Amino acid sequence: EALYQEKDKQAAQAAAKAEQKAATQSDEGEWTQPEGADWAEPGMKSYTCPSCGAELICDETTAATSCPYCGNTTIVPGQLSGMQKPDYIIPFKLSKEDAIAALKNHYKKKPLLPKIFSAQNHIEEIQGVYVPFWLFNGSADADIRYNCTRSMTHREGDYDVTDTQHFMVRRAGTVKFEKIPVDASSKMPDENMDSIEPFDYKELKAFSNAYLPGFLADKYDVSVDDCAPRADARCKSSCESALRSSVTGYSTCVPEEENIHIRRGKVQYAMLPVWMLHTKWNGRDYLFSMNGQTGKLTGDLPVSWGRFWAYFAGIAGGLAAVLSVLLFAL
């Protein structure tokens, strides 16, 4: 029975993948995966984390003592082979000290953070990691129709009268995309990577191992095909935003009908710099990610419920005071 359940599960997954592929083929072409050289060069070594499965690469002068994703301290040396060499890299611009300072500054801007968190919270591990990204290039043809309104209010006797005009607005055009990033590591939370964007591609360099000493590099484990739905969604979202920004002068603007056709092009493989900071407080681990180029930082923080309810009570008290004044005036 367990065997049949497993086969049913595999069949359902295969059907879902086929359906997804059919949906993406309604656009034009497929994303072209880069054909990079083998990365197995002299002076390079790899580690594997038995806890989360991360595969990490570094040069022979760099000691990897723990996993930057899960904090496991028993990572195992492995054999470097069959790894695709990246096309590009953005070197680290900010130091470990910059990352620590950014984390402390991050604490200051959180009014609901427990006071003792920053005092008792200790950085267990901080590592610079080159995170693998697929960079998608292509274009999209879009034709979107909006229902827009323009409202004006005037006074007639004792009444305020609002006149609303309705307009059908159409926008069409072609939007080109260059290097739309999608992280290619299953260990890295997608929301973390989305939060620390953008990266400045003006500092993109041809890949060289010379940028690796002192840092780790994560091997990609999410293929171009598996990243394609996210890339398509980001292309469409960017296209919608570009056309929507051209519709101005209206009170409201709601898209009624849209037709977006993606033309898929070349995909490039890049390593982008991220500082990973592990902290611990009250027996719980907290992971923070900082853009190693721009300093933008994100991560989860605990909430002081005492501060939360005090903050909420303050807002409620203010609203009650305003309401009482209004009622008294009436």
Q: What residue ranges belong to the model's regions?
A:
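N-terminal cysteine/histidine-rich coordination modules
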Residues: E1-A37
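Short, non-ligating residues that shape and space the ligands of small metal-coordination modules
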Residues: L3-E6, C58-D59, V76-P77
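Short, intrinsically disordered, charge-biased short linear motifs at domain edges
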Residues: Q33-A40, S51-C58
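Short cysteine-rich clusters marking metal-coordination/redox-active sites
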Residues: C49-C52, C67-C70
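Charged, low-complexity helical/coil segments in non-catalytic cytosolic or luminal regions
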Residues: G82-K280, D285
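Juxtamembrane boundary at the C-terminal end of a transmembrane helix
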Residues: V322-L330
